Amino acid sequence: MGIGLVRPAPEEEIQAMVEEISASNIEAIITKLVSFGTRHTLSQQNSSTYGIGAARDWIAAEMRRYAGDSEGRMSVVVQSYVQPVASRIPFPVRISNVVATVRGSEEPERVYVMTGHYDSRVTDVMDYTSDAPGANDDASGTAIAMELARILAKRRPRSTIILAAVAGEEQGLYGAGYLAGTLKNSSTNVEGMLNCDIVGSSTGDRGQRDPFTIRAFAQGPPSYESATVAARRLQIGGENDSPARELARFSAEVAANNVTGMNVAIIYRLDRFLRGGDHTPFLTAGYPAIRYTEPNENFDHQHQDLRTENGTVYGDLIEFVDFKYTARVGKVNLATLWSLSEAPGMPRNVTIDTTVLDNDTRLKWIVSNSTAVASYEVVWRSTTASLWTKMLDVGKVGEVTLPLSKDNMIFGVRSVGINSKKSPAVYPFPG
């Protein structure tokens, strides 16, 4: 039943875009960000050469320069608010996100977000005067957001893509929280969020190298689900099929290939131990979100005062960044974002019939009235498999019965466009 799932070969359009990503541009952006001395959220904001204010203004100017090639499709705003005294915020401070929006040409109401944070820190999270280059954490992610903005400014995505450099991450995810809250309060349909944080090095603290892998951290059962829904998810074995994990599977399917030169290693966790990231506020807001992070971290080069002790160099210095690796991570992000944007939206109200004891699987969903949707595809895998292994195109219908036991498989349904692009799968709940 069905056929083996085959990862789609990247089309010429995606190949052309990812080839535009320049390691030299990545290096130039990171070098400039490091030159501001510190980008600590609490650092000064009235200088043109030093502190987070200088970094903010330079990022915004560059983004606006890119927008000049967009024929009006890209807009750039500096989204700011004053954060009152709070955890890691000893005095009121203005937190600013630089947000570039490439408006979709056909479905502008469907939105995808990619972020990197441009603030930095040293050992003491409250030290806002010492130099904090933050070359890897997270000038690397910011550089990817900016490089993608440069490239996408010249394209016409079907859906809207937001590329943001956010602040306040090191103090408590404040900038990303404000961005996610703003989108949520305006009822924006964000169908996917990618967070790039610490994506600049291919070498770990023991010298281990893996220059062709990026980790994708994906949360299990969503924290926003009610107790009733969470209990039902566990009852039916859906703990590994959260929207975040479907997004991670999608990224692995479309962006782990010879064009990007990368493997996407899905990690079934919200984040690393003792760490957090800007995807979390988006998850809390109910949006599918994942975090990309390099495979082997060197903690001597994160959150450290600049110093040398016993021959060991500490600090997040630019000399430890692998620009070619960072560019490849950018290719993964671009391939994922573009594939999401060009595919139809995810199917709605996907359910599985569990009212009778039998060995069939009956699935239902709402048929989209969009002419961009050509059909729907059912995908499935064994309960112990990480990725989808089988697929069956069932046409543009709203239900299907398969002679496969729902007890033995995990099922999903995804939309297929007239352009053959496929959405992330949606896991069915009983209904």
Swiss-Prot record:
GO terms for biological process: proteolysis. Its EC number is 3.4.-.-. It is found in: Secreted. SUPFAM superfamilies: Zn-dependent exopeptidases. GO terms for molecular function: metal ion binding; metalloexopeptidase activity. GO terms for cellular component: extracellular region. It comes from the Eukaryota. Coiled coil: none annotated. Keywords: Glycoprotein, Hydrolase, Metal-binding, Metalloprotease, Protease, Secreted, Signal, Zinc. Residues 344-431 form the Fibronectin type-III domain. Its cofactor is Zn(2+). Zn(2+) 1 binds at residues 117, 137, 197. Zn(2+) 2 binds at residues 137, 170. It is an enzyme of class 3 (hydrolase). Pfam families: Peptidase_M28 (PF04389). Belongs to the peptidase M28 family. M28B subfamily. PANTHER family: METALLOPEPTIDASE M28 FAMILY MEMBER, PEPTIDASE M28 DOMAIN-CONTAINING PROTEIN. This is Probable zinc metalloprotease Lema_P086240. It comes from Leptosphaeria maculans (strain JN3 / isolate v23.1.3 / race Av1-4-5-6-7-8) (Blackleg fungus).
